[in-house]
Regions:
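A motif-centric signal for short, conserved binding hotspots located
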Residues: 72
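A short helix->loop->beta-strand "cap" motif at the edges of active sites that frequently abuts
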Residues: 75-79, 97-98
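Secreted, periplasmic, or luminal enzymes acting at the cell surface/secretory milieu
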Residues: 2, 6-7, 12-17, 21, ...
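Extracytoplasmic/secreted envelope proteins and their assembly/folding machinery
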Residues: 26, 30-33, 66-69, 111-115
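Short, glycine/acidic-rich beta->alpha junctions
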Residues: 20-25, 60-64, 109-110
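Glycine/threonine-rich flexible loop motifs
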Residues: 43-63
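An anion/phosphate-binding loop that grips the pyrophosphate of nucleotide cofactors and donors
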Residues: 36
Length: 179
């Protein structure tokens, strides 16, 4: 088992003046992936990007996470991504990887649960709780989001969530209940 950090969780502070760049961390991860039977990349959204009481500005993952996944997948054809977070994200690298495990917000036992799934000790049986769109532009809230400081307009009527995508006959990456 070889570990490589791959990216930083948050932006540098004054005390971090000597830390490696994201590009250097990605390069280390690529080198580790080249010799591995399987490369497992952990990415997603931390409390720096989403949380209770505030909205995200985009459904994109951090650029350094996307760059890391693509670079590792290019170096190792057997790349599996473990995605953490509490909401939908775009995954431009999805066609480049062998597998995806959406671990959600795992809490204190999340690491053990992910390890049990990755090693085959348990069979994952969860289903998606949201529809994963192909882009933000096909989302029913596009054009109304993010709203104002105290208001949020929901103009999709009863066609919220998966009902919108079904009624509009839109292709999606993962439908509600997938898995």
């Amino acid at each position: 088992l070889t570990y490589a950090q791959g990216y930083y969780k948050s932006a540098p502070t004054k005390k971090d003046k000597n830390r490696l760049s994201d590009a250097e961390l990605t390069k280390q991860a690529v080198e580790a992936a080249k010799g591995a039977d399987v490369a497992v990349v952990f990415v997603g959204l931390t409390e720096d990007f989403e949380g209770e009481g505030y909205d995200r500005e985009t459904i994109n993952m951090p650029a350094n996470h996307n760059a890391l996944v693509s670079a590792v997948a290019k170096a190792n054809a057997n790349t599996v991504v473990v995605l953490a977070g509490g909401s939908v994200v775009l995954m431009p690298w999805l066609g480049e990887v062998k597998g995806l495990l959406n671990s959600g917000l795992g809490g204190q036992a999340g690491g053990i649960a992910v390890a049990n799934i990755l090693t085959g000790a348990v069979n994952p049986s969860g289903k998606t709780s949201e529809t994963y769109p192909t882009s933000f532009e096909v989302n029913p809230t596009y054009g109304n989001y993010p709203g104002g400081p105290v208001t949020s307009e929901h103009k999709e009527s009863v066609f919220i969530g998966y009902r919108y995508y079904d009624s509009a006959n839109l292709d999606v990456v993962f439908p509600f209940g997938y898995g």
